[in-house]
A protein has these predicted regions:
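Bacterial N-terminal signal peptides that target proteins for export
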Residues: 1-8
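Amphipathic beta-strand/beta-sheet edge segments enriched in Tyr/Trp
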Residues: 23, 78-142
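Short beta-strand->alpha-helix linker/helix-N-cap micro-motif
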Residues: 26-85, 94, 98-100
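N-terminal signal peptide c-region/cleavage motif recognized by signal peptidases
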Residues: 16-18
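Residue position within the beta-strands of beta-propeller blades
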Residues: 95, 158-161
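Extended surface/linker regions that mediate inter-domain or inter-protein docking
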Residues: 152, 160-163
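A short, compositionally biased domain-edge/stem linker segment
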Residues: 21-29, 144-147
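Structural signature of eukaryotic scaffold interfaces centered on beta-propeller domains
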Residues: 141-154
């Protein structure tokens, strides 16, 4: 009498071994609505612990909202030829610089609207070396907010609490 339930349980367990879930994630309709933004390599960013422009580009690309265009190296004080950036397909351009001063890094950044030929944002902060990456995330947040109208979440932290 006990062998029948045991056999049924064994059969169910053997059948379950072969079963596995396949997870498939599709992101549709993102590429046609992406905002093209050019992000220049920040002047002297190789002196900082974090490569500012690389962090910013990665944040914007991973959001799915932006199509990042490589702008090469530029300084935040360089003259901007808006028609050149429009012809390259960029709706916005982010430029910046990083300078070390007394053990801190002065990070400067500007965001331009290439269609309206106008400056949208500027930011300048002196940060400790360990916060250069966080500053890059904050710049990505600012770009996200200025171009979408929604607050960015790249510099936020996620907390997971269990009871």
């Amino acid at each position: 009498m006990k062998t029948l339930p045991t056999l049924l349980l064994s059969a169910c367990l053997l059948a379950a071994v072969g079963a596995h879930a396949q997870v498939r994630v599709e992101i549709a309709g993102v590429s046609s609505n992406q905002i093209p933004v050019a992000v220049a390599v920040f002047a002297d960013e190789d002196t900082a612990p974090a490569q500012m422009s690389a962090v910013i580009k990665a944040d914007l690309e991973r959001s799915g909202v932006f199509k990042v265009i490589d702008a090469g190296a530029m300084s935040d004080s360089s003259a901007i030829d808006f028609s050149q950036w429009k012809s390259r397909g960029a709706d916005a351009l982010a430029v910046g610089s990083v300078h070390e001063n007394n053990g801190r890094f002065e990070v400067r950044y500007k965001l331009f609207d290439t269609i309206k030929s106008a400056q949208l944002s500027t930011l300048s902060n002196a940060v400790q070396p360990r916060y250069t990456r966080l500053q890059a995330h904050r710049i990505a947040d600012d770009i996200y907010e200025k171009l979408t109208g929604t607050r960015g979440a790249f510099a936020t932290r996620i907390a997971y609490v269990t009871k």
